[in-house]
Structures are given as C-alpha cells and as structure tokens.
Amino acid sequence: MIRTKSAWFVVAWVAAGLIGCAAVDEAPTSNGRAPAAPEPVIAAQLAAPETRVAVVIPAATAPVIAPAEVAPVATSPQALDVVVQRAGTRLFNDALRALGNAPRDLVIDPFIDANTGQQTLAGVAAGGHLARLIAENFRPWTVRPFERKALAGNPLLLIGTLTPVALNEAGNGPPDAYRFWLTLVDLRSGRIVAKRLDRATLASVNAEPTPFFRDSPTWHMDRTTTAYIKSCQVEARVGERIDTLYQWRLPAAALLHEAIVAYQDQQFAQARRLFVQATDIADPDDLRVLGGRYLTSWRLGAKDDAAQELKRLVANGLAAGSLPLKVLFRPGSTVMLPGADLREQYRQWIREVARQASARQACLRIVGNVSRSTSATASVELSQRRAATVRWLLAQAAPTSGNRFTAQGAGWRDNLIGSGHDDQRDALDRRIEFRVVDCP
C-alpha cells in the first residue's frame, strides 16, 4: 500500500524545454476554448506495489527521433472501426521503422474525449481494437494491463483522444465528425515515437461515458487531463518529449485506472481503497480522486464519509472559481430527473454549495446550460429557468446569502459535446455551473 511517508519515489525522466506547436488542421467545437497549459515539472515518481524501482535513463543514452509531420488525414470521415484499424496500422508501422523489431511491452492509457476529459464507450472499444491489432499483426510487442508494475519496465505507451469537432470553416456549428488522435511514446526516453490523425463519422461513435464518468458529480479540465491532451494532440510532435506533468503523474494514472476498473466492476470497497491510496501520488486537483472517493463512499452507504468527500469536492471547485455539477433535468423542463437516490444527492450537493458559499461570503452566479436540441433563443430561456430553479434552492439552504446568488442562462453556447441527444452522451452539456464572481 502506498502512503505519503513510505512511497518509493524515483527519478525516471527529466523534462527538456517546452513542447512545440503546429497548426491545427480543423476547428474545435463551438466552445472554442483551449485547455490551459500545466506548469512544467522536472522529476517523475514511480511506485509499484511491494516493489522498489530504480530506473534512471541518462539523457545521453535516450534515442533521439527526428521530428516529423503527421501524415495528412483522410478528407472524409469513415466508420470508427475502419478509422481505428487504419490509423493504428499506420502508427505501429511508423513505430517499427523508428524502433526496430526488438521485443517490447506496451500499455494503453485509456483514451479520452479532449473536450471533456471523460472516457467513453467508443474510446474503450478503440483501445480494445488496437490491443487485438497488436496481438495479431505486431508480434514484437506484448500488450500489458495499464498498471503500476507494467510501468516499472518503461514500456511503450499508447494514448489517444476521440473528440467531436465541427469541420466547417468557421467551426461554430454542431459537430459533424470525431477527430481521432493516436500517439505512441517510448517511456525509455520519454519521447514521442509516432503520431496519427484520422476522423470518424458521428453515427459510428458511442459517446456515452463509462460508468465511473457517468456517475461522477462534477467536471472540469484538471491539470492532469490537460497534460494528457497536450501530449497526445497537435501540440507535441514526433521526436519531442511528452508533457512533463503527464509523465510525472503516470504512476497515479495507473493506480486510478485500477480503481476505476474496480468501481465499474462494482467492487466498491476495493475501489475506495485504491482511490484513497492514489491521493498521495495524484495531483491535488485530480477529479478522479475527489470524485472516486465520494462515489465509493456513497455506494458503500457510508453517508458521513460521502459528506466529507463532498466538502472536498465543493471546496476544490469554489477555490478554482467555478464548480460545475451534473444537476440534470428532464428534457425540455425544469423538473429534475426522477429517482430517490439521485434527488437525495442533488439536495446534498446544493446544500453543501450554499453552506460553503455562505461561509466564504462569496457571490455566486448560477449558470444553466442545455443540450443543442432546440433553437438558440429557446435554449437560453430554458437554461435561465433551470438556473433560477437552482438559485432558489440555494437561497432556501442559505437564506442570509440569497442576495449574493444570481442566475444566468447560457443556452447551448458553451456546449462541450454539442450532439443534442439529451441523454447520457451529452449530459455535461446540461450541467449547472456555480461561478464565483465579484460581489456588487
């Protein structure tokens, strides 16, 4: 078990400058926001269970791969399975040319949506497809589970993002394709070996989040997620080092992956133990830790523990200036989704936000968001009414602070997904945000 005072910390890689940038070949989705760059970190830690690891790769021995441009992407999107097969085959052939045929282990850090940081069912399917492709056609490599003990051998690391995008020139419409980035990293050097970019059709991508991310109460683009995305996408070129914060937090990412798998297998006690264990080595604002500790406490019926974890979640969001919560409503209405368990959680979330905002004497703007399933005008009106509903509940929970709470409707202007499905696939588009603002 890893603890703060007893973990074995190992210097494995040293960062070398800032990673370069290249022009993006397509526009982002309608929110148009790029994730903030994390602060550089120049050391990495690695802790495997009951194993002392001491791996230091001198800079002089690390193979240097000449920078290369990403090959042009196909002009029209194809079905996801076609895209994964094509991009994966090209990526792995590129890597074999760079590295040779020496046997290597390979791990896959689960793919994410670069707009939300969530893992989706389509991303899981793509990872499984590539693991089978390696086993069948790229025999020098052996796919290992993404766990701490596998990282001890400095394997090859495969990362990827699958993100909705608008391909029109202005980039301000609804998404009409998914952008698929694949990046292969050699952890012996910390450098990118190969990259590939492709596009998949909307209809072929199941964007429903996996159970852990579906159940998580909050969302924001934390530093660790941002570092993953920077390492995977256009900002980092072949031959360059991956983001140092991402590499530094790889042991935590592997431990959190084990915890998420346990949660999704409904092994809640095991999952909670792993989430607590990850607290010592993960970034302080990592929402997988904060959300995982809350969710597992709730699932185990430990309501007092869940309340304490909720306090940490809310405090983290308010300290950051924005706390998005997935307070979901029935499509087209201001009635919250039914279900005794869900509504009980909503009540606790809102009460805790009210309590902490009141204690801080903070002014909050409650911003409603809706899916892109109606006109712009109607979406603003509906999101305003939803925000007003939550503002009223906040004022009920903290009567003396009610005049410091205001409501605003954003419509679908700040959609992260933009599909307009009004279901779990675009649940984050219907979030309620509690933004800390200056008091009048």
Where are these regions (language model features)?
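A short, hydrophobic beta-strand-centered structural micro-motif
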Residues: L91, D105-P110, E136, R144-T183, ...
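Short, surface-exposed beta-strand segments enriched in small/polar/acidic residues
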Residues: N101-G117, L323-S333, I350-A387, F405-G418
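C-terminal motif of bacterial Sec signal peptides marking the signal peptidase cleavage site
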Residues: G17-G20
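Periplasmic OmpA-like peptidoglycan-binding domain that tethers envelope proteins to the cell wall
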Residues: G117-G127, A131-R132, D304, L337-A340, ...
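Periplasmic peptidoglycan-binding/anchoring modules of Gram-negative envelope and division proteins
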Residues: L80-L99, T334-V367, A395, F434-P440
